[in-house]
């Protein structure tokens, strides 16, 4: 008999004893959806879950609003919500409406306040019922001696102990609250501690962990793998409100496919930011658009449906706007021509009242045109191919050929190359980029590079190396003015403007910019390097969708070569002409599209999970 059925029988037996003592009969118990929506008291453990994932804000953030959802509802509705950060207004008089069972994709430009909004909701800046426990994923697991599985399940073990203590206390009380006791039993049943380790292993396995990696202390893991541990805990806890800020960052393509499939079944409230249209299409049931007017606008459906609906709405709004403006112009023309004739003056006053009523009711606003900006890399002089050639290259970090990460690599790269490198995490994609740049040296074979070749590399950690106490304008002028001494201030501003940085974003300290805006500063600096080859290691991690499209267009018209490592299927499809897979110490050129590659990967993920079940991993 399972622990779940045993606890239920125990619950029913105790309930029967109490009711029999009162001379009453036992009524069939009913289970109505998620238990959290029925709690009558503040659940201290669910509060603890929020505290696991949030901390006091480092920077100044203020928010206000009015909770209007019902106290015991599993939904959240907050009216008149306003959010500021560093004194800058991000959201004004908007409505937060998050319904149980829905999965929301949160969209907005870089710097619009998406991450700050998630932090505000997780921190309960505007209070909502404590029975709705929340978890915000925005940081990696801390380094410690605890292994991945124990790190994940410890908080759940603590919650079970507290629930058992509460049940014991409620069961022995003089005046037993049967409804509350029932909800506590149901909550304990749903957790089922006997499955904790298996469930944790299943999630870790899905995100690419082997059995050996699961047993490693988190202090022995890289930041990327610790981020996966943190993501695994968020999925394991399964809070009533799960807030994920760019969860696909640090994942390889295979893990992204697994996460898409997992989150598509999430049956509580999910709010996720993502730069991947594929991900938003496969996961989300709704879209929230944080607009330039500082409003939260809600759309039903996934990203593609959102785009179609938004375009239709804007088309209809433009028609209504033009029609109304034409009507107003016609009325004003009549009023202007009325002169002093008494009967015409009366008509003119009547017509003016029509305009006054329109204005009082609110005129149709002209739709804002889509924000347009483009990344731009300067043209460079063509070099004869191959400008980079690998000849029988082998590489090992310890110099031992028996431990080689690569063997027998032979290929060429030229200025027409548009290569996307794919493969699992840990197979050496970033290492390959470092071999191309010369940062790493082969232990066998050689890499030849054309004399005068200039390369520029973007890595997912490039933004962390920016001088945070300087503004973007100060940074690029201090760094590149010796290279371009003739440039005036406006020309430097223009460089930043080419990458969507304008106004205060150019002159504010870099530390105050969003991660996406910091990434744009890095791209502006890369453009000033005027390279022949761009090496891009996860360039989309902090860019919004508009920025990614701008990057893709810039790459496609640029005259230099590009080698790309990315987990963004759409960007790969937009820019790559070749797919190279890193596998079994080799680099293999694939004869398929990225869409076909994703389909084959999805089949592999499904097969792998089936195998894991057979091996009792789950």
UniProtKB/Swiss-Prot annotation:
Domain of life of the native organism: Eukaryota
Keywords: ATP-binding, Cytoplasm, Nucleotide-binding, Phosphoprotein, Repeat
Post-translational modification Phosphothreonine, affected residues: 54
Gene3D superfamilies: P-loop containing nucleotide triphosphate hydrolases
UniProt domain ABC transporter: residue ranges: 76-325, 388-609
Cellular compartments per GO CC: cytosol
CDD domains: ABCF_EF-3
Skewed-composition ranges (Basic and acidic residues): 14-27, 36-45
PROSITE patterns hit by this protein: ABC_TRANSPORTER_1 (PS00211), ABC_TRANSPORTER_2 (PS50893)
Protein name: Uncharacterized ABC transporter ATP-binding protein C16H5.08c
Protein species of origin: Schizosaccharomyces pombe (strain 972 / ATCC 24843)
Record: residues binding ATP: 108-115, 423-430
Record lineage: Eukaryota, Fungi, Dikarya, Ascomycota, Taphrinomycotina
Gene Ontology terms, MF aspect: ATP binding; ATP hydrolysis activity
SMART domains per record: AAA
Family to which the UniProt record says this protein belongs: Belongs to the ABC transporter superfamily.
Region: Disordered, residue numbers: 1-45
Annotated compartments: Cytoplasm
Modified sites of kind Phosphoserine: 50, 53, 55, 64
Gene Ontology annotations of biological process type: ribosome biogenesis
